[in-house]
Amino acid sequence: SGGEQKRLVLEALLRGPEEVLLLDEPDNYLDVPGKKWLEEQLNQTKKTVLYVSHDRELLANTAKQIVTLELGHAGNSVWIHGGGFVTHAQARKDRFARLEELRRRWDEEHQKIKDLVQMLKVKAKFNDGLASRYQAAQTRLRKFEEIGPPQEIPIEQNVKMRLKGGRTGKRAVVCEELSLTGLVAPFDLEIWFGERIGVLGANGSGKSHFLRLLAAGGTDPELEHLPISDVTIDPVTHEGKAKLGARIRPGWFAQTHHHPELVGRTLIEILHRGDEHRNGMQQEQSARALDRYGLAGASEQKFESLSGGQQARFQILLLELSGATLLLLDEPTDNLDLESAEALERALDAFEGTVLAVTHDRWFSRTMDRFIVFGGDSTVRESDEPVWDEKRAKR
């Protein structure tokens, strides 16, 4: 598997003679036991390791210093935080406040010197004795401006997601003797309005199939339970029942499926024209929505030309506009940068509805109320705590 290949390569590098390792997303494709193994190796190795990662748990458990690439109007810069990830966010906030204060003081002093130069210029016209003071003030202003202002405040990515939802029946999802053919043995389950449920288990255990069944409206879906997007959802062969509650509108997010309905169209065009399930938006309104998701600069790009993270943010924006009351999220943080992942967590916290999320993100899982675990033995069970050590299902 991809995870096994990644682990083999990392093992070879860690055992090799090189004293410095440069690792680009070393945790990608690793399951949670694999990530824990990587953390142990990084903490034990005597090598110098510089790695890129968006896994907040990995960063918190291994990084001794954090290097942040910061965007700026005059070019990008690098800031190094001498502590770990847990203190990084507050340290960056404090640094921004210091830079803002330094700029405010510089602007005040700059204005004061300019005012002095202007005053002496006027007075020197009528008093030759002030000419030397006027020239000295001009020199002072020139040198002050040559030194220039302090470092500019970096441009922050300010993503604001607004997932609204709405009131539904008390029982959002009810499963009775539900089995997924060839994957999962029969199980019963009740999910209540407003719950945040983490769906856990090894790859191939049936998690994504379960979400896909609900995304299609469950067993014999009623009209109000039909999908809220134009994505074609492949049927899931099953026995038993999976029923959605009153006023449940499922919204599905999965980064692995294709989007022929979006390909060939720009983001502004997709929002402006709408679709069968979503009203179109005025150009100005569309631009504001894209700006909230950090996509203003990509408004004229076609969907397929976006990066993985941009596509993920745009799909979440479409979920926001869809009016879904049940969010079915399949690895939602996989391609999101740290700021976007935190914005998603804030939006889910404010969402009036029910959330089911398949995830291997240990940090993100802390936002869940309880967990459904798809076991390697084809059983499904509930847990109050996340379970990460399920073995791969054998078929």
What does each model-identified segment do?
Residues 1-101, 161, 165-395:
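ABC ATP-binding cassette signature C-motif
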Residues 95-186:
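Flexible nucleotide-interacting loop at or near the entrance of a catalytic core
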